[in-house]
């Protein structure tokens, strides 16, 4: 079974299953299609979190973006920050993790 907010993305996932892919392959195809047809709902510029249940075991993936290479926690503290600024500061912008998450899921659990 495949479910998404867009029929094209759902169809993409179903095609992957019909062609021998597993649930992880289908989820990646569905998510990638959503990034094209509905980027306001599921874009490649975001993060990815997954729970995968295989052979009685649950695996988790946190593909949240990391801080940029120029961000230094000690310098931020020295600048007077006591928590991460959420607005109007480049330090709060992360590197997107979605595509790296697809790669990690595919390498570990994909079959196609």
Range-by-range predicted roles:
Residues 1-11, 15, 23-112:
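Noncatalytic scaffold domains of N-terminal-nucleophile
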């Amino acid at each position: 079974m495949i479910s998404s907010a867009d029929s094209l993305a759902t169809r993409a996932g179903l095609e992957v299953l019909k062609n021998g892919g597993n649930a992880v392959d289908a989820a990646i195809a569905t998510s990638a299609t959503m990034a094209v047809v509905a980027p306001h709902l599921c874009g490649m510029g975001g993060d990815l979190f997954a729970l995968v249940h295989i052979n009685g075991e649950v695996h988790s993936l946190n593909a949240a973006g990391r801080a940029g290479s120029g961000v230094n926690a000690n310098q931020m503290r020295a600048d007077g920050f006591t928590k991460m600024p959420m607005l109007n500061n480049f330090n709060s912008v992360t590197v997107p993790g979605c595509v790296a998450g697809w790669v990690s899921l595919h390498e570990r659990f994909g079959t196609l």
